[in-house]
Amino acid sequence: MGGGGDHQQLSIKQYCLYFIIGIAYTDCFICALCKNLRLSTTMKLFVLLSILVWLAQPVLNRPLSIFYTKQILPRTYTPPMRELEYWCTYGKHCDFCWDCKNGICKNKVLDDMPLIVQNDYISKCSITRFIDRCMYFIEPKIPYIHYMNCSLPTYFS
């Protein structure tokens, strides 16, 4: 299961947004010309629309909160609690996603995951993030490192 379907959906969202923005820009420019507004007023409207577009970008394709997607996360075996759902969605086998007691393990985040017996499915993982590049380091699996774009995540298989 790759992230191909998600990527297509995000692209369609982006194209729709750009189409709407294009219509808004054109409408803004035509209204400014019809009302004989000065060029400086028209430019102010364009700048305002540009800022709104820039602020809307993270909403389109960021599974992580916009407040920490670009933050660097040094390599760690315990992801921050606010990011645990993100990391456990794409690396379900990582040990930090499971609570194990007496050999029975329950997933900390995904309620639809059944209880499992502690076994080789659960691997020791560490994670890191540098700008928009997220990585899992999985021990002792091969391949050892799973790279993904944080905004277009893929499942580790």
Curated annotation (Swiss-Prot):
Membrane topology: Multi-pass membrane protein
Subcellular location: Host membrane
UniProt keyword annotations, A-Z: Host membrane, Membrane, Transmembrane, Transmembrane helix
Intrachain disulfide bonds: none
GO annotation, cellular component aspect: host cell membrane; membrane
InterPro entries, alphabetized: ASFV_fam_110
Transmembrane segments: 14-34, 39-59
Protein family according to the UniProt entry: Belongs to the asfivirus MGF 110 family.
Function: Plays a role in virus cell tropism, and may be required for efficient virus replication in macrophages.
Descriptive protein name: Protein MGF 110-13L
Organism of this sequence: African swine fever virus (isolate Tick/Malawi/Lil 20-1/1983)
